[in-house]
């Protein structure tokens, strides 16, 4: 990669980074702000069962570009995985859910965070379909006072995700070395099972746990 090409690529990534977190936090940049209770409004690919309930949602996105030249092509898929954070106060040897916990000068509230995900897929001569997965998980962070006494904890939960990247390459009748590249990203995450860790219910905040959020592509 030449210096000019590398510079262009880094500039594109910087722009994509800004887009990736658009709507993650809205001014005045506080989790308890009313405006921050309605977030993640663009590039959201819901699982198929959600789209069946609400046709205004989408489970796939399609991109088509004209490629000039014979070089190799890679597709980088980027999105956010929702991470639901709950707050628990310690009482004796047990922890109980609360809406807010103050520890020293910090206030901790229930909030939807996000984990950045990125996958790079090479494009074959004719294209291909690749099915990828993102693991779920549960992490615990203890909150202590200056003396080291545990006052509470944060519990962060993520749902597993499954999605497919389908590429297709066509070579139109042309005197030039051009190709038509189409890329489709499908959210194939199944409905939540009995052991699902995140919230349930027929509402968008619950659905977002199984969505690809701020989904977009970088082509090189």
Predicted regions: what is each one?
Residues 2-4, 42-43, 48-220:
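Long, leucine/valine-rich, helix-dominated scaffolding and oligomerization segments
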Residues 2-45:
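Amphipathic alpha-helical packing elements
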């Amino acid at each position: 990669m030449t210096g000019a090409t590398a510079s262009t690529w880094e500039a594109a990534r910087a722009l994509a980074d800004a887009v990736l977190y658009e709507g993650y936090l809205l001014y005045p940049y506080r989790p308890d702000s009313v405006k921050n209770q309605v977030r993640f409004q663009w590039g959201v690919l819901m699982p198929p069962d959600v789209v069946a309930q609400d046709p205004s949602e989408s489970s796939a996105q399609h991109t088509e570009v004209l490629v000039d030249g014979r070089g190799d092509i890679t597709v980088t898929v980027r999105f956010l995985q929702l991470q639901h954070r709950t707050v628990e106060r310690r009482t004796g040897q047990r922890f109980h859910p609360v809406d807010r916990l103050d520890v020293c000068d910090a206030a901790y509230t229930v909030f939807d965070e996000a984990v950045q995900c990125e996958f790079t897929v090479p494009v074959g001569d004719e294209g291909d379909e690749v099915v990828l997965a993102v693991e779920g998980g549960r992490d615990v962070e203890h909150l202590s006072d200056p003396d080291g006494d545990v006052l509470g904890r944060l519990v962060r939960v993520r749902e597993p995700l499954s999605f497919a990247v389908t590429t297709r390459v066509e070579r139109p009748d042309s005197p030039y070395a051009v190709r038509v590249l189409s890329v489709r990203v499908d959210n194939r995450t199944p409905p939540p099972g009995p052991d699902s860790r995140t919230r349930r219910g027929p509402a968008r905040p619950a659905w977002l746990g199984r969505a690809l959020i701020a989904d977009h592509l970088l082509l090189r």
